[in-house]
A protein has these predicted regions:
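Glycine-rich segments within core transmembrane alpha-helices of 12-TM secondary carriers
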Residues: 57-61, 142-161, 167, 371-382
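Intracellular juxtamembrane helix-capping segments at the cytosolic ends
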Residues: 33, 122-136, 344-359
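C-terminal ends and interior cores of transmembrane alpha-helices
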Residues: 83-105, 310-327
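Juxtamembrane intracellular "pre-TM" segments in multi-pass secondary transporters
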Residues: 1-9, 197-240
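Symmetry-related core transmembrane helices of the 12-TM Major Facilitator Superfamily/SLC fold
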Residues: 85, 91, 174-192, 395-413
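Short amphipathic helix-loop junctions that connect adjacent transmembrane helices
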Residues: 31-46, 247, 256-274
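Helix-to-loop junctions at the C-terminal end of transmembrane segments
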Residues: 60-77, 167, 287-301, 389
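C-terminal transmembrane helical hairpin of 12-TM major facilitator-type secondary transporters
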Residues: 302-350
């Protein structure tokens, strides 16, 4: 049986399948489950509560990082034990939802079960990211990151559209069972494939811990914190942290402004906007992820990020200054798809950068902090849009155009001691 460090195919397939497994529960809860509950008479308060409790566990990612870096069954690999545990718990919590009596009436119980389920999904996410940092080689990070990101889109589509079809034809409980079964089948991959040759496949089998050159064991949580401080004391990782935050501000602004702008300002229906942004837009995101990952390995992270950011900025300037383009139906569609494609392109290239800058001993925590800063920036971006509401869309789009290129000031100095980050 191949190992993750010994086989590019094994690590690529494993990471992509794990990312699809993360996307499935998200699509299932936010699309299929909430749509079903709404059709059964659930009000906005009930569906909003479930949605909020599904999102909340993703803020715990910054806590999972130090835990998975510190505690593990090292003889089975550094990340596999956590992935196996979280994937198994994801399946178990879905099956537990079947035991809830009247699913449409017991919202409180269902909401907290959704919360618990997504706690394990977020843990699997952090563990998979840390595994990618550990096993991917420098010359494949961009391509594989693109494939992983695209796989998450596929998982979301399966969990949302696929499970939604199951619910419509067979009911909610069969959908719980089917999704739990799929997640359990995915569990077979991390169970059967070792990280490194010579490690234990399972706790009762033969094997021993294997450390890669430069990899260290962290003794305690204090050691993790110390290691993290040491990692960010270096100039490139610190600049990358500033870049991680700045690069996501505009994304948060876009998420906040697009639905209102398209439905209230230029007259799209809610249904049409949802179909374009959620359907064709998702496809554009998949293509952007695959292309961005492929080109980042060949042309360099900075080239791809710069192209993506300048492209988005140009779209925003055009939408802001030209009322004629703003009223043009073709440009309205091109703007949505083009910005989605370019944002996905630069995002995947950025993931490759963050992974290359991670220190092995605290890789899980360090990478998670980069992601946490990006998530925080999206909240900040939405707040910026709210503060600009009275200034009009021209100002908002011009601020978005500036916000998407500003991070380049943090990106370009990242070179000293990091020759793999190509200019």
């Amino acid at each position: 049986m191949p190992t993750l460090t010994g086989s590019k195919t094994a690590r690529t397939v494993t990471l992509c399948v794990l990312y699809a497994a993360q996307g499935m529960p998200w699509g299932f809860v936010t699309i299929a489950l909430l749509s079903y509950l709404a059709s059964q008479g659930a009000g906005l308060a009930e569906t909003a509560k479930i949605s909020s409790l599904a999102t909340l566990p993703w803020t715990f990612k910054v806590l999972w990082g130090p835990i998975i870096d510190r505690f593990t069954v090292r003889s089975m690999g550094r990340r596999r034990p956590w992935i196996i545990f979280s994937q198994l718990a994801m399946s178990a919590t879905l099956l537990a939802m079947i035991l809830i009596g009247d699913l449409t009436a017991e919202f409180e119980t269902l909401a907290w079960m959704v919360f618990l389920h997504n706690c394990f999904v977020s843990l699997q996410d952090v563990s998979s990211d840390a595994l990618a940092v550990d096993v991917l080689k420098d010359d494949e990070r961009g391509t594989v990151n693109g494939m992983m990101w695209a796989s998450s889109y596929v998982g979301t589509a399966i969990g949302g559209a696929g499970m939604g079809t199951v619910i419509a034809n067979f009911g909610l409980r069969p959908a719980f069972c089917l999704q739990a079964g799929v997640l359990f089948l995915i569990l077979c991959i991390p169970i059967l494939i070792r990280e490194r040759a010579g490690e234990k496949l399972l706790p009762w089998t033969e094997g021993e811990p294997k450390l890669e050159p430069g990899e260290e064991e962290t003794e305690d949580i204090a050691g993790v914190v110390k290691g993290l401080y040491g990692a960010f004391a270096a100039w490139p990782p610190f600049l990358a942290a500033l870049y991680a935050y700045a690069a996501s501000l505009m994304i948060g602004m876009r998420v906040a402004v697009m639905p209102v702008f398209y439905t209230q300002e230029i007259g799209w229906s809610d249904e049409h906007y949802s179909q374009v942004e959620g359907g064709v837009g998702s496809a554009a995101g998949v293509v952007g992820a695959l292309v961005g990952g492929f080109l980042a390995d060949r042309l360099g992270v900075k080239v791809i990020v710069t192209f993506g950011m300048l492209g988005v900025s140009a779209f925003c300037v055009a939408m802001g200054v030209s009322e004629e383009l703003r009223a043009n139906e073709s440009f309205q569609l091109i703007f949505l798809l083009g910005t989605t494609f370019l944002i996905s392109l630069k995002t995947v290239a950025s993931f490759a950068l963050f992974m290359r800058l991670c220190t092995p001993a605290v890789a899980g925590t360090q990478y998670t902090l980069y992601m946490a800063l990006a998530n925080l920036a999206r909240v900040s971006g939405a707040a910026i849009v709210a503060s600009l509401e009275s200034d009009g869309y021209r100002t908002i789009f011009l601020v978005m155009a500036a916000a998407i290129v500003f991070p380049l000031f943090f990106l370009y100095p990242i070179r000293q001691g990091q020759p793999e980050v190509k200019a």
